[in-house]
Amino acid sequence: MATLNPSVEAVPAQTTSRQRWLYSIANLGNVIPYQAVGAILLFYYTDFKHLPVKWAAMAMTVYAIYNALNNPVMGYFSDRTRSHWGRRIPWLLFLTLPCMVAFAFIWMAPFDGIKDPGKLLAYFYIVLFIWEGLATMTSTAYYSLLPEMFMDYKERTDVSVRMNVVQTVGLLIGAALPAVLSTALGYPVMGIIFAAIACAAMYIGIPGMFERKGYQDEPAIPLGKALKETLINRSFVTVVIAQTLRFFATGILTTGMMFYMKYSIGADPSWTTISLAAAFIAAGLALWPWRHFIANKCEARTTTMIAYAVTGVSSITLALAHGTVQAILAACFVGVGLAGLILMGDVIMADVVDEDDVRTGQRRAGMFFGMSGLIITLSSALVAQVFGWLMPRFGYDSALAVQPATVDAGFRLFMSVPSVIGCGLAIAVLAFYPLYGKRLKEIKQKLAERQNQ
């Protein structure tokens, strides 16, 4: 039986609707670049630029490790920042523009993998590493503001719905449109357009952001101790493992969709836009029902477990689909499950930050979101390794002009089985998550008492 949510009757909202919308709009600045990289980077460098598949898989793994390691470092620096503008906002003000310039260069590779594979690989590493370092800092600063600006459960789920309505737009742009725009305009122009939209969204949203007084005055915890305190936190460890499995499942979906539509469904790759758009629109439409009928009646833990179950079951339909109509319907089914995961991801992590605040007296959102980014990012390495291990066994070779018929089954398997396994493991892990029922209610009460002192 679902546990009734003890957090829905909390303190009145402390932010305005305008502030919540502005904060949410800025989410486009994170979503568009990351979704574009997740959805089409591998396709661009293998199928279009002809980087050998094994090289690409290894490069993505190295990139994922780098991305993982820089997350806690950036989070720690964000927590320690002291400035007139606060701890988080300066990073958004000054790094957003160079971040988007670096993103645009990802899609301007001047080398071909058949003639100059070494140079193409070097270019891949340089531009991707520069972009990723800047993007990690800005995204960590952005998400660290969420538990500080929005203090109670209803306010957080409200802003989460808004963020994810915006995120649906970002998913449509960043993950669904590349197949069309890259064909019509070319990859370089596509990258410039995406960078401009993301940059504008972040700067539009910054005026609605604020930091609460007092948190910047807290004494900083040394890096070693901060890492230790984070990694021994049971609530954090269980959530971040589940989140990693979530991003593994969704990474499979976005990475494989263009291959799946081309080689399994037999459709033009541009149908990827329609199938992903269908999934994201379904997710956007499902956000309100998820919040109203499930999240407001169940705790974050229960809601998240239900969302994993729906996502895992729906992934099976991708393996069974034949023809574009069935593939699109299957994608819509997956989108309904994703809506629950999208809604609760930042909300459940905010509860972890609250618990740590009560326990240590420190507001360490940067470290938690940074460490979360470190571990979650490893999911992309796992996706790349599964792709690199599985698809050559079904005959996929990026150097071939025509792929063998066996790749059909390979991509059906790639799109379904890993996601089912990931979602099942996530549910098992969340069974050990301690912030529910009486414990969660105690944390909320203690935090409210501290704020009222």
Question: At which residue positions do the language-model features occur?
Answer:
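Membrane-embedded alpha-helical bundles of multi-pass transporters/translocases
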Residues: 2-453
